[in-house]
């Protein structure tokens, strides 16, 4: 799994040691597992996947002090939307009344996507990862609420994001696409660690 520690510097300041009580929750019907600090609330809803178009979705969420940890799984079956269209629209939605400070590739083993840091006009701050995988959009977000002191440790944000796993062992990239990423990232100690063609880690020689 890709390290995301360098993103945390743009998200929260130093804080106390990690809270106890985190547990992994597995959802085999949706091919993922993720850790939460408490039993997540699960809600059914809709998600706007394109302008004037919504799809069924599920939200798994926990609020702990001033941070909301959430996972959205939106159904893409039958939408005929490309990955770039899905991800670009998700970023557009996240950008409403907010500023995207960072937008770089993300990777969880062989599943590739995007990773963002977002600052809301209301003072909130979010760290988000987006993956279009097997006819679903997965959106994982840790959001620090506005006008409150950040009491959750950096390690909790890292723990949440790095706990996400796709449990069916699949990929959303062809072998050719993976080879292209590794070629761009050949300067890394292990080119397989590259997350995308525009991975900033791969541009540093």
Can you annotate each of these PLM segments?
Residues 1-4:
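Positively charged n-region of N-terminal signal peptides that target proteins for export
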Residues 6-10:
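Hydrophobic helical h-region of N-terminal Sec-dependent signal peptides
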Residues 13-16:
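N-terminal signal peptide c-region/cleavage motif recognized by signal peptidases
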Residues 18-54, 100-110, 158-176:
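N-terminal "mature-domain start" segment
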Residues 29, 38-40, 46, 75, ...:
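A mature extracytoplasmic/lumenal domain signature
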Residues 40-41, 85-98, 136-192, 200-205:
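Surface-exposed amphipathic alpha-helical segments
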Residues 57-85, 139-141:
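A short acidic-to-branched-hydrophobic micro-motif
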């Amino acid at each position: 799994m890709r390290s995301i520690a360098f993103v945390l510097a743009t998200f929260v300041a130093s804080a106390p040691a990690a809270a106890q009580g985190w547990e992994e929750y597995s959802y085999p019907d949706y091919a993922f597992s993720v850790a939460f600090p408490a039993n997540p609330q699960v809600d059914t809803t809709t998600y706007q996947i394109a302008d004037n178009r919504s799809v069924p979705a599920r939200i798994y969420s926990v609020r702990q002090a001033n941070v909301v940890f959430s996972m959205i799984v939106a159904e893409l079956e039958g939408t005929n939307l490309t990955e770039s269209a899905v991800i670009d629209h998700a970023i557009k939605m996240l950008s409403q009344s907010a500023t995207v400070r960072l937008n770089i590739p993300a990777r969880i083993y062989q599943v590739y996507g995007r990773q963002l840091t977002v600052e809301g006009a209301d003072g909130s701050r979010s760290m988000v990862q987006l993956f279009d995988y097997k006819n679903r959009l997965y959106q994982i977000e840790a959001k620090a609420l506005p006008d409150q002191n950040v009491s959750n440790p950096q390690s909790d944000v890292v723990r949440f994001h790095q706990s996400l796993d796709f449990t069916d062992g699949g990929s959303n990239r062809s072998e050719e696409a993976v080879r292209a990423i590794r070629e761009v990232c050949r300067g890394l100690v292990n080119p397989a660690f590259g997350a995308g063609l525009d991975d900033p880690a791969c541009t540093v020689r």
